[in-house]
A protein has these predicted regions:
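Metal-ion/cofactor- or nucleotide/acyl-coenzyme-handling active-site neighborhoods
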Residues: 1-257
Length: 257
């Protein structure tokens, strides 16, 4: 499979390559189709999952279990534009709560927060390792990376500079749905930290009457996980930036400043 990668970059085979590799290794293409069509898995994730199946291994990597100190408050940073638009207020809120860890669901806006001194946890699912390498340099990386429980269906990818500071969750205990999503990992991190107050920013939701398939999947995924988390956990999810998710408790971050 490694030999395919330079050819993929040259010829841009897109989603055809996973099918080609699956066929060459007698792996059911129906399963590959479900990865390509039904979920927003990255190309690299799909190829890695196929390679793991070819090699008959559960996963291509394993890391130590997360051992975390408790934290009463946790801030989860999503990928929505509100986490950028209201950054000055968010930064002020963070600095006023120095013991509050920051959990990044995605590294999309991680560079904005690089100078914030609070403990940082980066969720690595799907294409997030690649995004993290693009948006955060080794010099600006301070914190830990967090993976879903072993084994991971789509395999494991971690930036080389984070190899020694990467951990995996023992379990996703609050839901049986979407256990391989970044939101599930972030919410489980809050449980592991024994948080009683969970704040989120950047979970804007998707506007418009007609959503793309990816937007519909992600919107429903987040909605279900928020509901499951609040049903099974005492912590309330407070969104400090505007959000279309009705099951979040919407508050203005400016009231905390």
């Amino acid at each position: 499979i490694t030999a395919f990668m330079p050819l993929y970059e040259e010829h841009k085979w897109g989603t055809n390559l996973p099918y080609m590799i699956a066929g060459a290794n007698s792996i059911p293409q129906k399963e590959v189709m479900s990865w390509v069509v039904n979920r927003a898995y990255s190309f690299n994730s799909i190829v890695r999952a196929v390679e793991n199946k070819k090699n008959k291994v559960k996963d291509n990597a394993r890391y130590p279990m997360l051992k975390s100190n408790t934290a009463a408050k946790v801030l989860i940073v999503g990928g929505g534009n509100s986490s950028v638009e209201h950054f000055d207020a968010i930064e002020e809120f963070i600095l006023a709560n120095p013991d509050m860890p920051i959990v990044f669901v995605t590294a999309r806006h991680a560079s904005l927060y690089k100078s914030v001194p609070n403990r940082k946890i980066y969720c690595l699912i799907g294409n997030e390792a690649k995004r993290m390498k693009k948006n955060l340099s080794e010099e600006d990386y301070h914190g830990i990376c967090l993976l879903s429980p072993y084994p991971r269906v789509m395999g494991t990818e971690v930036p080389s500079f984070a190899e020694d500071t990467t951990f995996e969750l023992p379990a996703i205990s609050f839901t049986s749905y979407y256990k391989d999503s970044c939101t599930a990992v972030a919410l489980q991190a809050c449980i592991e930290l024994s948080a009683t107050e969970v704040f989120v920013v950047g979970y804007d939701g998707y506007k418009g009457e007609i959503l793309s398939e990816k937007e519909m999947v992600l919107s429903n995924e987040n909605k279900v996980l928020f509901e499951e988390f609040m049903k099974s956990n005492k912590a309330i999810l407070n969104s400090l930036t505007p959000s279309l998710y009705k099951n979040l408790n919407i508050k203005s971050i400016y009231q905390f400043l």
